[in-house]
């Protein structure tokens, strides 16, 4: 049974590229202070799952992450897991100083199944990433996830996959503040420090709901074989009503 875990929310150095993760940018968008990057909130919520399920989840598990309300940098966040009857685990991010909770929810499963078929849409240029530094095993430690498996075994942290998808959004779809709202992440193999991966992203939907949103299918492959696949949603233009 996964156990609760508490961490202090923080933003990493690379997140200042999105103004919403700075106090000034967040206030300009109507928030009281800097929003923590959703991918870092995801990193926290994976902690109870990996502590309980280990590398099996990193190899073939996955889950759906939904961001319901902002997590503000500097706050204490409780990651509270519950087990469902079907074997899934739901982990909620709780900020005890806020009246509305949970702030975010991860529903994790031990077997996420095979890679889904790629859908038609607007294909973005392929990219290649080296899984090290900001996209390597150390992501969790920098964010506050203290599980030893990543540094000890050079296993890439699961938050790297939505972090890569976020980089695709940041550099390919937006020009100002934007917000990551949802991801479905499926793991298909372990990745380790220094691996090179090719990333193929397709914009499969655009719609307006509290801003202009984009939904991407993202395939992250090593030597032609998927390591992770994602359905990744973000508000890419906050100025659209």
Residue ranges and their predicted role:
Residues 1-60, 113-182, 241:
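Hot-dog-fold acyl-thioester-processing enzymes
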Residues 1-7, 67-131, 190-241:
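HotDog/MaoC-like acyl-thioester-processing domains
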Residues 60-61, 73:
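General structural concept
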Residues 62-67, 182-188:
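Short structured motifs
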